[in-house]
Regions:
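Conserved core of the sugar-phosphate nucleotidyltransferase
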Residues: 1-87
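Residue-level signal for well-ordered alpha-helical positions
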Residues: 32, 54, 100-101, 160
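Catalytic beta-strand/loop signature of glycosyltransferases that borders the donor
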Residues: 82, 137-143
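Conserved nucleotide-sugar donor-binding
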Residues: 87-99
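A C-terminal functional module that forms or caps the active site or interfaces directly
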Residues: 99-133
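Hydrophobic alpha-helical segments
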Residues: 127-135, 160-167
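Terminal low-complexity segments of carbohydrate-biosynthetic enzymes
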Residues: 155-177
Length: 177
């Protein structure tokens, strides 16, 4: 609802007006392997300053770390690091930007590594920020993110959803027939 309220209260002006929900990194990690997250820097006004997709973040004990060289070196990330889980609020302007940037992305990246060539949404958002074409309001969440990255994550996620249903946060039947 917060993203809807933000987008409903503004429209694109001299800059595209977008929004995103950011989570604390530690609330998004799995015990079962590495994850990809958009690591965010937020300015004093609560706007996204930049976002860098880190495609291999792992928990090592109580520390979250990422590597960009297949594990040869690791960089620490603070537990309060804000990350994107791709919960974005865009105006329709994002569609033309995604379309315009897709073919150049493929031309640059497809021949290098076709099996790992992924068009990450945060890459486009970061380009728009650097070009001064967009402003992204960051809505911070303190909630835990539940997702199934690995099959071993499924039980934890289903147990968490059941707990939310038992606690009254969700109805007993989420999807009525």
């Amino acid at each position: 609802k917060a993203i809807y309220d933000r987008l409903a209260s503004c429209g694109d002006d001299d800059k595209y007006q977008y929004a995103m929900v950011a989570y604390h990194l530690y609330n998004t990690l799995t015990e079962n392997g590495h994850v990809a997250r958009g690591v965010c820097t937020v300015d004093a006004d609560g706007h996204l300053a930049d976002i860098h997709e880190r495609t291999r973040i792992e928990k090592h004990g109580d520390q979250a770390e990422y590597t960009e060289d297949d594990g040869a070196t690791w960089e620490k990330l603070g537990e309060d690091t804000l990350v994107s889980m791709n919960l974005w609020g865009f105006t329709s302007s994002i569609l033309k930007e995604l379309k315009a940037r897709f073919v150049p992305f493929l031309e640059k990246n497809l021949s290098v590594n076709p099996l790992k060539c992924e068009y990450f949404l945060p890459f486009v958002v970061d380009e728009l920020l650097k070009e001064g074409k967009a402003e992204v309001t960051v809505l911070k969440s303190v909630d835990r993110w539940y997702g199934v990255t690995y099959k071993e994550d499924k039980k934890m996620v289903t147990d968490a959803i059941q707990g939310m249903k038992d606690g009254g946060l969700y109805p007993k039947k989420l999807w009525e027939e």
